[in-house]
Amino acid sequence: MVPEQSLSVVVPVYNSEASLPLLIERLEPVLAAHAPSFEVVLVNDGSPDGSWETVSQLTERYSWVRGISLMRNYGQHNALLCGIRAARNQIIVTLDDDLQNPPEEIPKLLAKLAEGYDVVYGAPEEEQHGFLRDLASRVTKMALQSAVGAETARHASAFRAFRTEVRAAFVSFQGPFVSIDVLLTWGTTRFAAVRVQHDRRRLGTSQYTLRKLIRHAFNMMTGFSVLPLQVASVVGFVFTVFGFLVLLYVIGGYLLRGGSVPGFPFLASIVAMFSGVQMFALGIIGEYLARMHFRMMDRPGYAIRQQTAAVERAAPRLVAGMHA
């Protein structure tokens, strides 16, 4: 039997006014059956629709629902970080707002967590995303491998459960570029995954765009990994060796066969190739320098516009915990 512990469910909200009431209705019986106390933290990530109004209505109807509204759209992981820091219970569960992660699958994650793991992912038996979301998932996992390793990255998903103690590892993290999965690896190596059902999206449309996909994957690789720098170093080394071999070939041909040294077109192509490699490497270095610049500016990962009363009453406790 799984020992009961208090639960906090954190849900990033974006343009989901239609699905939120259904999500809460399905969460209530699951949480009531598996936790002595529980809460749901809905973080509105600058939704332009009526999502915040829906969140406010839900907090009035359910005493265990709390709401936070951010100043603008910061991104899913930034909103999650805000909600995770606001969570007050022993176990934190994160899931999307689109009902593709069935709340009824939460007990599977809790059961695996009870075996001694610190973080458990719900790995979909068969993903039911659209093309862009599937592509986003694949690219993100590839980028995540460079930061956390292939084993963890393979099972990473937005449906996860972890012990609140893990949060202590990134309680002082600051910066605009956030990856919850990388931050979790700062606190533990005890990861596991269980197979869960993954439903088709029936309400609304995916908010993933090609621009968001590229931005998140690039943030993953340059924000929490040195892989791009390593790749640039290897590419630079390979082209250096290539240039050296070309030089030997030209000199050898001139000395042994008496041939003429290739003219301007050949030399121009070699110079252009090496200049391109140098610019590529400088661009990557510049990206890292820019990120250092942003962190030195103390640019926050999110800013809160307003909170429901339940969150405001908990604020003194939260601040004390963050600065302990």
Segments the model singles out, each with a brief description of its role:
Residues 92:
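Short aromatic/hydrophobic "clamp" motif used to bind/position activated sugar donors
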Residues 36-47, 68-69:
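Short beta-strand/loop segment that forms part of the nucleotide-sugar
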Residues 18-21, 49-58:
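Acidic helix N-cap motif at the loop->helix transition within catalytic regions
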Residues 1-4, 179-324:
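Hydrophobic helical membrane-anchoring modules
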Residues 1-29, 35-36, 318:
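N-proximal low-complexity "stem/linker" segments adjacent to membrane-targeting elements
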Residues 57, 64-72, 76-86, 100-183, ...:
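Acceptor/aglycone-binding surface of glycosyltransferases and processive sugar-polymer synthases
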Residues 44-53, 99-100:
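A conserved acidic beta->alpha catalytic loop
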Residues 8, 37-39, 66, 118:
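Structural signature of beta-strand start/N-cap positions in the alpha/beta core
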